[in-house]
Curated annotation (Swiss-Prot):
Free-text function comment from the UniProt entry: Displays phosphatase activity for serine/threonine residues, and dephosphorylates and activates Pk92B kinase. Has apparently no phosphoglycerate mutase activity.
Pfam families linked to this entry: His_Phos_1
Cellular component, GO annotation: mitochondrial outer membrane
Protein name: Serine/threonine-protein phosphatase Pgam5, mitochondrial
Keyword Cell inner membrane among record annotations: no
Amino acid sequence: MRKFTAFACGTGAGLLTFYLTKLNEPKAAVHNSWTRSEKPVDPCALWDHNWDLRDPKSLVKPVKNDLSQEQNRYNTELEKVVPKHARHIILIRHGEYLDVGDTDETHHLTERGREQAKYTGKRLCELGIKWDKVIASTMVRAQETADIILNEIDYEKTKVKNCAFLREGAPIPPQPPVGHWKPEASQFFRDGARIEAAFRRYFYRAYPDQTKDSYTLLVGHGNVIRYFVCRALQFPPEAWLRISINHASITWLTISPSGNVSIKYLGDTGFMPVNHLTNRIPRAAKNVV
């Protein structure tokens, strides 16, 4: 009987220990997976507030001493360079086009591509945006897309600017690499510098003298837009090829006065009929991209 009692006590103690251990495990699991920790998991997760070299604090001489006059001087100069309004940059990919011939001059929009551009123009019109600037890539498919969109929105065609920096290209070797698309290193070297220059030309926080939110429309290309999205949101730029955007889609990025960047739309084509949703060469047709 004593042996049985000892065995029962030992078993009970073991089960109690096991139960208490398992009871505490969920708390540890929740703590380890808690995503609201103030300490970033990786230094890359930290936001660079001076990404455009226009952080107000970087534009003003720092305080030299503790005197009130010096502090007043600093505050006065800082106030003069602080932006008050946001910049909205809306990026449109060209419509579907015919990949015929070896030169850009023969790469015209398909009939569906022209209809895609018209749907996009109507959608932009519905949004009621008053455009400050409209800029288009100099490639034929982007020019044709922009021209169709301009028929639908309130903006004078004579004011449109053309920019060769926005032409399609290979921005940076993607990660992970893909087997079906391997440009030469020289192409990345050449195109990458140009596309990065385009990003720096169009992406920056508002200047202090900007009196209202501004809206810029850029009509360009898939690779360029995807690279811009990664750079603007401070994602690894090598990740650009992981993103897919449809023809004539709308991507909307906002740069707030603080320099923070947010994305409102990414490749939006929800306003188009299903049979107009394309992003690459259709199976039923050759030489169309």
